[in-house]
Amino acid sequence: MTTPESFALLMARTDVVNLFKNLKFVIIDELHTFFDSKRGHLLSLNVARLRSIKPFQVIGLSATLKNTNLAKKYISNNKNTKLVSTHSKVAPEITILNSGNRIPWSGHSPRYALSEIYSEILKFKSSILFVNTRAQAEILFESLWAMNNKNKKIAIHHGSLEKELRKKVEKEIVEGHVECVVATSSLDLGLDWGNIDLVMQIGAPKGVARLVQRIGRANHTINTPSRAILVPTNCFEYVECIAAKECVELNFLEDEIYSEGSLDVLAQHIAVSYTHLTLPTKA
């Protein structure tokens, strides 16, 4: 298990041929996230180079993929690339929080619904509250902690925290020591927890695929519906939440964005690929 960056370093080793001599499969998780990023371009280059060293099968995984032709093109230009798809028979249970207070016309704070948010997380053993920015995560975490008269075990998780602290929070969620975590996109991908009972999206999700991905954190099992509550922070976001909810119910996803390979990534790849070779001094 590795990342595109660490994989690139492995490909630069002098023993790369021996290192991957028994390789049979390469599995790319969350495939859709690599189509429009330099990390994706780097990964594609190294997979292609590794293929020239040792043939193997590439498997791409995604829960929110719409453009299957793009996925096939990214994995391989081979016409024999096959698509295997499945759809959950259990639809997610999505609601929009009904607060007794008026939704603000503007702003991005859920302060008007704090008591309702706290009441919801008290109903469930474990929950994740997704927000869209790190500042929102800090403010919401502090607000919930200040009103936490039931001593709910609440934590925070975002990319600006030290790696060791993030890993500790993730471990404590799995072990059941943390009952609620306020998080940004740092918990969107790559973590399979079957013990999360509720997901709350604070603010508009800013994308149907992102909402589906976040909803999937709850009850990460096949035959159990995921529970999600959307909490708009202003009137316009209320409309966005309605639209996002309807799109999920209709199985509608946005098209993935694809960008051509970056020349700076190509230059880096060429340089790293030849670092272990002795090059002639005369051109």
Predicted ranges, named:
Residues 1-4, 12-272:
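Helicase motor core with emphasis on the C-terminal RecA-like subdomain
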Residues 275-283:
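Conserved small/polar residues in nucleotide/adenosyl-binding loops
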